[in-house]
């Protein structure tokens, strides 16, 4: 009896691991990625996602200025993003460094050196990033339906500070804009509704 119970438990765990890493269809990836985009721009965004072998690929070529990223099937929960096209060199470099095995701090430091050296360009004007997320239990990977999703807003303003923007470095109320990484190449305004 113990052996049967163990085998059932092991099979359930293995199934959950397999299901967690299953790559949704291109249609589902596009549908969920577009949840991060402003409603009026969703029809013409470029969308990147993952092939069945989990390689990062172009799923749909768009005609507007926004690039959306589908959820990473290797991560728990749902996290999709959409950003202004001028952020693509910064975002792509982050993906490359992550693929090389770097952690968050190493990626931050490497990109900072590259921005200062002029080999990595940041936008010259403010640039938006939208991130939509949900817990695993609230995302159906077979239909793309999401319950209890959360959308946060980021506006990149390289080298801006609290003094240059009038924004605090920490929010003191829900939904209050604040500046993160002030004074760095990666300074950005956070808005968490």
Task: Say what each PLM segment does.
Residues 21-193:
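Primary mode marks residue(s) on the alpha4-beta5-alpha5 output face of response regulator receiver
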């Amino acid at each position: 009896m113990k052996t049967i119970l163990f085998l059932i438990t092991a099979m359930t765990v293995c199934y959950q691991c397999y299901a967690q890493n299953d790559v949704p269809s291109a249609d589902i990836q596009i549908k969920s990625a577009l949840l991060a985009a402003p409603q009026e721009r969703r029809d013409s965004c470029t969308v990147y996602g993952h092939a069945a072998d989990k390689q990062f690929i172009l799923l749909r070529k768009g005609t507007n200025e926004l690039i959306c990223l589908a959820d990473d099937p290797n991560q728990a929960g749902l996290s999709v993003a959409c950003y202004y096209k001028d952020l693509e060199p910064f975002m792509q470099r982050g993906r490359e460094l992550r693929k090389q095995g770097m952690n968050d701090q190493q990626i931050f430091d490497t990109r900072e050196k590259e921005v200062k050296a002029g080999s990595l360009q940041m936008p010259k004007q403010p640039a938006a990033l939208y991130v939509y997320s949900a817990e695993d239990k609230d995302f159906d990977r077979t239909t793309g339906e999401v319950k209890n999703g959360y959308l946060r807003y980021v506006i990149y303003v390289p080298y801006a500070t609290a003094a240059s923007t009038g924004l605090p470095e920490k929010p003191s109320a829900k939904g209050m804009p604040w500046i993160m990484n002030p004074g760095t190449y990666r300074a950005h305004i956070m808005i968490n509704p």
